């Protein structure tokens, strides 16, 4: 029973770290990254579809992306989806591929993005702490119901604290890496 609670808590904490990592990928750094288009949805014959499933996205240069649709008839749909996204980029269509040049970020914009990264990291840490609180409540309930002894529950609480600290440190590491990436000119 205690092992299940610890295992479940660790899984949820890992999910929180992954979600934070995914959210940070979407923050633009001034460098071309195909993952920035993961959340961009285009209309594919009436079905909302991620453009990553409609085209190949390559990085020929540090600040340029090439998007080659699998079907040329989808070129305009993909172009419009990118223009309408909140990425702040403007694709150019040469008939064969879409070229997306990533503009250089200003110092102020870099700081704003770093603040956003910190905020996303804080959200991730809050989610991890909420999982910890839920796990602690479950452990106390088990002890109260008499399903586990006080020593077992205390050991499990210490283990849960260790796991929490480990995942909070992972979030801090991911955020620090993203901030360094953002502040790099």
Swiss-Prot record:
Keywords: Cytoplasm, Protein biosynthesis
Tagged with keyword Cytoplasm: yes
GO cellular component, as recorded: cytoplasm
Protein's cellular compartments: Cytoplasm
Listed GO MF terms: ribosomal large subunit binding
GO biological process, one term: translational termination
Predominant location category: cytoplasm
Pfam families, alphabetized: RRF
Top-level division of the source organism's lineage: Bacteria
Statement: the UniProt record of this protein carries the keyword ATP-binding: no
SUPFAM superfamilies for this protein: Ribosome recycling factor, RRF (SSF55194)
InterPro entries xref list: Ribosome_recyc_fac, Ribosome_recyc_fac_dom, RRF_sf
PANTHER family, alphabetized: MITOCHONDRIAL RIBOSOME RECYCLING FACTOR PSEUDO 1, RIBOSOME RECYCLING FACTOR
Family: Belongs to the RRF family.
Role played: Responsible for the release of ribosomes from messenger RNA at the termination of protein biosynthesis. May increase the efficiency of translation by recycling ribosomes from one round of translation to another.
NCBIfam families (alphabetical): frr (TIGR00496)
Name this protein carries in UniProt: Ribosome-recycling factor
Source organism: Corynebacterium diphtheriae (strain ATCC 700971 / NCTC 13129 / Biotype gravis)
Gene: frr
